[in-house]
Amino acid sequence: MESGPRAELGAGAPPAVVARTPPEPRPSPEGDPSPPPPPMSALVPDTPPDTPPAMKNATSSKQLPLEPESPSGQVGPRPAPPQEESPSSEAKSRGPTPPAMGPRDARPPRRSSQPSPTAVPASDSPPTKQEVKKAGERHKLAKERREERAKYLAAKKAVWLEKEEKAKALREKQLQERRRRLEEQRLKAEQRRAALEERQRQKLEKNKERYEAAIQRSVKKTWAEIRQQRWSWAGALHHSSPGHKTSGSRCSVSAVNLPKHVDSIINKRLSKSSATLWNSPSRNRSLQLSAWESSIVDRLMTPTLSFLARSRSAVTLPRNGRDQGRGCDPGRGPTWGRAGASLARGPQPDRTHPSAAVPVCPRSASASPLTPCSVTRSVHRCAPAGERGERRKPNAGGSPAPVRRRPEASPVQKKEKKDKERENEKEKSALARERSLKKRQSLPASPRARLSASTASELSPKSKARPSSPSTSWHRPASPCPSPGPGHTLPPKPPSPRGTTASPKGRVRRKEEAKESPSAAGPEDKSQSKRRASNEKESAAPASPAPSPAPSPTPAPPQKEQPPAETPTDAAVLTSPPAPAPPVTPSKPMAGTTDREEATRLLAEKRRQAREQREREEQERRLQAERDKRMREEQLAREAEARAEREAEARRREEQEAREKAQAEQEEQERLQKQKEEAEARSREEAERQRLEREKHFQQQEQERQERRKRLEEIMKRTRKSEVSETKQKQDSKEANANGSSPEPVKAVEARSPGLQKEAVQKEEPIPQEPQWSLPSKELPASLVNGLQPLPAHQENGFSTNGPSGDKSLSRTPETLLPFAEAEAFLKKAVVQSPQVTEVL
């Protein structure tokens, strides 16, 4: 290809004039014997005209190996040789080519349809058309690749966005699932807590009901036992035998009429009896009492007036109580368990065993811990054998009393009996000292006391001579018995006047028993009973003032009516185990009285005792009602207080639960809010990271495009330099040919650019010597076309689809140069400014 231009340069025509004139489009290629040089816009057809500047990188170095396929035989990086045809002929020869055809498919029709120029050699025209077509194909392929790349990036971005949406939806779903699980856990925990509280409440209610029922049972049982134990002391006096009736009549003194000097003994005995009652087995069953129940029991344990009256009567009449207590069985101590049995069955002796035929003492029958059994030995050991035989005879003869067997004592009861016996021994010693002191004080006895003592001594041999009747065989004899010594006998002690005067109830019962007694006693018993009744009346006559001073607060005189000779013997009897005495009281009651005054006196005494009994019972009932009322009020107050405390506790518990629940909900909300904020922060960080990744990716792509663009610019610069030199040589040869053959092109060039023609005329000789400014003059239109694009009609790389418009825009360049004075100065300026334009690109 280079051989043609070099041959044309050797033709010898002057080419300097035509080298600087741009070619003018001709109307038709047929009429021109010599076609003009191609326009400058067709020199570098790199990229398609409709590509934006940012997408120039598509024409990378990958497309450059396509250029050696052209049959032009060019060697080097030149993309396209100069075109020989005019733009109009090129447009005609191009025709309606499809945009999607490849470069290999488009070559044969372009070779066949392209007319060969007449003046240009045949080796130049086919490579030019092929290069143009290849450039168009490359542009189209580059455009397609850019579109595919854009589609790929859009699809990738859509995939990224879709993945991000999926991840966001998954995070939301996980958060909702976590919230749901937490809510379910909270509900389950609340249900479990509510069920646990309900079970605890039911358990507390059940325990409370059971505890209240146990307390009620314990209180009722304790109160019933205490009432039974306390009132049984008085009840035993009314339900027992006539001997007990007499002792009950003695004990019916009110508390106001008791003497003052007995208070210390009563207080001692009361404290001991309270301790005994408190430590009893019935108390041990209800030890688990609260404070207020203990206070109630303590209040109930305080002595009443009747209790003090009985205690004072026991102290006032110690001789009778001690004599009666001597017949107490060792197995029948003052135990609470056998008190009710002795009250219900009455004191019946055991007839089967010879040593068991012992009457029960009245104090042990009444289950009173205050009056102990003085002696544990039975009456058989102190009485003579004859008396024992006489006593057993009427019982064996025809006694209607049933046989009573004593139950076996358990080890616990034996231990209790031993403890009570020790306490009784202590009380006996204290009472013995007190009585001995009183006996010393009452040594000068009154003649009435001596008289009663003499009558008692007279009655004692009679009572010894006769056996006891079946009705009186259950009671203890009241008179002293002789000492167990063989030859030594104690002087008999007289009974007290109150002991001789029996109560009206006792007399009535004696009459009934006398009627019911068997008639086998005989006339001897009747005569003896009559004599005994007359003696009793005689002894009761001097002792009649004894009941009258009973209401007075002065002490009763029975203790003082004892002879002084009895003091040492009585002390000896008390220190040693005393023996029972034969009975002094009449064993058979009299049928009635014939004295009107005696009957009136007995009736008045009976009425007085009944009135006192009613008053005592009424007072005790009032006190009991007050105690019950006070107890009920206290119980109601305690229940109200406990209920208020429970309600306050329930309110406090509910408030505490509400606070805990609110705190738990607040903590849960804070935790959920914190989790939400953390999730949002993580999502923001993820989005920021993805955005930075995309930006980095886009920057990398942009950098790659810039690098490709720079490489392309460098290639374009090298290509332009080589093309400018070749084009200048071709134009010189063409101008020389044109000047030699036809002058019309020269005229046209002169008409269009007179300033440039003048410059070419002035400097036609040193063309090869001035390549410094001639090369930029050729490069100026190309730089304007390929660089800045001053006109909107031009496309990016100077390749236009409509050739005439591009030629017209190039034809304006000499008109813009007209206002300057000299074209040389403008060209010099253009030479200076053109490198700056290239640097900006």
Curated annotation (Swiss-Prot):
Using the record's annotations, give every residue carrying the modification Phosphothreonine.
47, 51, 97, 118, 554, 813, 816
Set out the biological process GO terms recorded for this chain's protein: microtubule cytoskeleton organization
Q: Which residues carry this modification: Phosphoserine?
A: 70, 86, 93, 113, 116, 123, 125, 254, 273, 313, 366, 399, 442, 446, 452, 454, 460, 479, 496, 544, 548, 552, 742, 753, 834
Family annotation (InterPro entries): MAP7_domain-containing (IPR051483), MAP7_fam (IPR008604)
TM annotation in the entry: none
Q: Where is the composition biased (Basic and acidic residues)?
A: 130-151, 405-435, 523-539, 594-735
Q: Which Pfam families match?
A: MAP7
Cysteine-cysteine disulfides = none
- Here the cross-link named Glycyl lysine isopeptide (Lys-Gly) (interchain with G-Cter in SUMO2) sits at 462
Name of the protein described by the UniProt record: MAP7 domain-containing protein 1
